[in-house]
């Protein structure tokens, strides 16, 4: 139960009493010395009524709605009409305390401090009766025969309608417990009149008309000021000094709070025949609430448990319609039912019940366990040995002793949970979340299994009987059905609020919505019928439907889905549907359709249902013939048609199956001689060719194709024989003809090959093409039938067909989303333009989808493709420009992948130094236009954070300043603003440990280099590691003019000895890498190294002076110190000299990217390939 505030108003004086007009449209309030009339629909003050001279204490409306009365401290009573006009006024000797109209005679009882009076419209005077104490409250019984008076001395006086006392009830406590409010239960279903009494001894009690107390006093723990029943008497409202209105059952069990106020509640009433409650307070507040009583229930198969009267639980057997009531005498908060278990959550405990016996119809429950703990949960589920509590995003699994065994934390709010069965203690749960995620949880497993994730929130779930399909109703009222194994959305239907699978049929489900019940079988259209309520279960032909608070079992005929299956010739499925419940006529229709579809097993079962022995005998005979080896289905169907009286259809099938004699016998037996003569043969096949041809024409005209074919062959008319055989699909006859023909007869052989292709016999077609030597047609055949291996083999033997094979193959690969293979196939076919176009599209898609590693790889492949195309002199310059451009983009995207992962994903495993190096590399590389997909914001944000973390405060401040000029996403806006402020507190310089060193001139370069990734002193370009992006200790050098690459390698390989110390470099070369490593006794490069002299340059020059070496320098170099990028022509090889002896560098022989050896080995172990060009370690060539 929850209370929703509809409207609220504030009067200037205390609200002592109020009354509803019986039709509920108006509300009369006693506020100060006036009456206030409100419209209950929106809280509009209609009119204030003046007439009293002092505070109005009470007001009451007559049951017929014609009059209402008010009593005041000015000792007067005013009678008002429903038109808000005062018509009568009379007085007492003291202030008026309460008034009440007789519900039958409309007699008015008015009570003061010393007496009470009875007035009716028929009498002119008011009969008054003295009272021994101050009367505080009064109430008439339902039949209007008795009036109960509550007094300040703790006595309740029950009088007849003439004022004579009949019963006197003395409350314990006497005058210390004044009676402050009383009310008779208005229910007509109660056997006795029941009076509810609230006194200032802070007790709530109940009495019969005889004065006998019902049950014990109920403690309230506050001074009650008002008590009021609901219209049907099922609930009680009590308000008072606790500044709130409490809801009780008619037995006095507290259920909850309607509304908390800021002052004492002096009066509260229920709007007639509704769940609206109005509250009047000491401070003049009027609050109008709507009470919403939610349905608390649980369902498992044919057992349905629901809450009744808020404190009882009723278990209903939906098949037998038996019901059993379990009285809890406390507020029932949650109910869960599963097999023989029933769990009921009360405010301070959970009760677990079990059935007495294993009988499926047993309805006797007994308490199995009690968990005496208070739990707060949204959903409750019971299993064989556990209780599952759902709290927002968390699930807790408790044993029946209350011990928490397991807990699951979800990503989003849990919207739906259902037990889907399983062994005791290992049951499975189906859980639907608000974020659209659907999980399966086993109570003995800590890890949830994600079944699928959809975009919309889950409202309802159900799993099919075999657990292969999942039906989901989302917040858009759409029913979606998924294949659990493939996650594929099978179909979806609109206007659904609940869904249930048939427990006896895998492919049937029903869902409700929009006032209709929808039944869907497989993927067929929905069958609808009108039905109000929510579908909660589907068992066989019964659908369990919940409407408001009532659960009912609806019998639904299964004819419609059965005929849907029959239309698709799905006979076995149609039989399964029929077993759920159809008529005899439906069974016969199913049997006939199955028999015509040659589904004899289904037909036999269906005919058995309708006990048709004649057709059962036919089915038995056909099955016996099939056991003997007969396989001609047309012949079987012809027999079926003849049994059904469809003689002409039977004759056609006999003819089609080659058993014209059976048709002849059939027509003869039926004395249908006119039809029988159509099956008579004529002519002698041994006559002349002309006669045979005419006979063949006649046979063809009378639909005797086989005979016609044989005759045409005998007559040498092969073309006509092939035409007839091909049109009838006789492949065996066609291949016989083709094999008998000479290879010189090209036209008929080509006709045979054409028919073979049409009849899906590519092997025979290939044999025919080979026979006539038509290799081009054979290649086309292989391509059309996707027999690529044969096509490739033929292309290798005959290169002139290579283009005819690889181009269609590449197009087929592209159509099947195998783009990388398609690109290679285009390349192999010499279609460079298509190959490049495929790569460009792949690259663009990778960038758009933020797959930057793939983008880098595709750009590298593009560059190598362009380098290959640059061998054409006409395209050399353009292709080399593209090569360098794509190489540059590949390096950018390769580095940016790490930045993207760091900024977009919740966790990053990259070192701060790596992130710092990459972002600095990108910053210096993005001096011009920024490529698509690369975010300067992310790059600068990463650089700023890592610079600050590593002590490069000056660079961090520069990055934050740059960010101020860019459009920042909202998710990192606060982080950047905070970083911009905090960086100001740091010193304005960078850590010396981070400053990059030029290995040529030993100059310390600033972190922010206006020249980009080159030395500011000597302009020597930096060589970066492709993994950590640290500056490598390499210097590129160039060969003196006249020295070829082969001569240079030969000079380097001479390895002239060094006299100072032994050279200790060790080189490891393989197909996968070229590695320099240092032996333990390695000495640094001496000052007498000729290469060192070549590193010098002219100071102060702004031009880059490359290092150029001659033969003597090359001869002095050790092969172990040199790395060579052996680019294919027209590019020149690139040479690099290692200047530090204490670090090992590895270069990939395919993409020529440099790595620290340890990094490269780790990355190759992780990916089994080069991280840059994806060259696998088991590849033998570069």
UniProtKB/Swiss-Prot annotation:
Main localisation, per the record?
A: other
Q: Enumerate the WD repeat regions by residue range.
A: 10-50, 51-91, 93-129, 131-169, 174-217, 219-258, 260-300, 453-492
Listed Pfam families: Beta-prop_IFT122_1st (PF23381), Beta-prop_IFT122_2nd (PF23377), TPR_IFT122 (PF25295), Zn_ribbon_IFT122 (PF25144), Zn_ribbon_IFT122_C (PF25143)
Phenotype of gene-disrupted mutants = Embryonic lethal (manifesting between 11.5 dpc and 13.5 dpc). Multiple developmental defects (exencephaly, situs viscerum inversus, delay in turning, hemorrhage and defects in limb development). In the node, primary cilia are absent or malformed in homozygous mutant and heterozygous embryos, respectively. The Shh signaling pathway is impaired in both neural tube patterning (expansion of motoneurons and rostro-caudal level-dependent contraction or expansion of the dorso-lateral interneurons) and limb patterning (ectrosyndactyly). The proteolytic processing of Gli3 is altered.
The UniProt entry's GO biological process terms, in alphabetical order, are: camera-type eye morphogenesis; cilium assembly; dorsal/ventral pattern formation; embryonic body morphogenesis; embryonic camera-type eye morphogenesis; embryonic digit morphogenesis; embryonic forelimb morphogenesis; embryonic heart tube development
Provide the protein's localization: Cell projection, Cilium; Cytoplasm, Cytoskeleton, Cilium basal body
Q: What keywords would UniProt list here?
A: Cell projection, Cilium, Cilium biogenesis/degradation, Cytoplasm, Cytoskeleton, Developmental protein, Repeat, WD repeat
Task: Show the GO cellular component annotation of the record.
Answer: ciliary basal body; ciliary base; cilium; cytoplasm; intraciliary transport particle A; photoreceptor connecting cilium; plasma membrane
Subunit info here reads:
Component of the IFT complex A (IFT-A) complex. IFT-A complex is divided into a core subcomplex composed of IFT122:IFT140:WDR19 which is associated with TULP3 and a peripheral subcomplex composed of IFT43:WDR35:TTC21B. Interacts with IFT43:WDR35; the interaction connects the 2 IFT-A subcomplexes. Interacts with IFTAP; the interaction associates IFTAP with IFT-A complex.
Q: What is known of its domains?
A: Forms the trimeric core subcomplex IFT122:IFT140:WDR19 via the C-terminal region, whereas it interacts with IFT43:WDR35 via the N-terminal region containing the WD repeats.
Functionally, this protein is described as follows: As a component of the IFT complex A (IFT-A), a complex required for retrograde ciliary transport and entry into cilia of G protein-coupled receptors (GPCRs), it is required in ciliogenesis and ciliary protein trafficking. Involved in cilia formation during neuronal patterning. Acts as a negative regulator of Shh signaling. Required to recruit TULP3 to primary cilia.
Q: What is this protein called?
A: Intraflagellar transport protein 122 homolog
* Source organism of this protein record: Mus musculus (Mouse)
Question: What's the name of its gene?
Answer: Ift122
